[in-house]
């Protein structure tokens, strides 16, 4: 198949050869049909990408906000080492920081080096949010703009910029456990949304 990796619905996402050497392609519609058949609901691959982008953004904003000064000071060196390793291996750079694997950390490293992470003023907090979004966009293989406009739940970004995010996130951490299959950060994100999505709806209506 010569169409692997394109953005059109007719493009192939994967291909494989069976034991007889027959060449098969897998398109987005095949994956979405599989999800619907096995989940018995009309979910698509984009739903999963949207969810991943949303909870990761929220969790990483919280992680950066909770990080100590010593932890933040590690970021520039970790990023530089990751870039150097990438030049040797040919793989995209990534770091391990506070138990998480992060890609696209150039923005975080620059803010940490200048002492502006997580930031106190509106401008610095906005820069922190954009740097966090860069790490999520790197996971998804999208640009910051696409990730921000099409995948991340606006509630988390709006609350961060208005200064209420961390209070709400910390309260959501002690909320109901909604499934053993969920990561702790996913569970917190669900509690957060369940609690505040009505507030967001009312805000958008006014």
How should these model regions be labeled?
Residues 1-82, 96, 107-198, 202-206:
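Extended accessory and catalytic-adjacent subdomains in large enzymes
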Residues 87-96:
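Charged, low-complexity interaction regions
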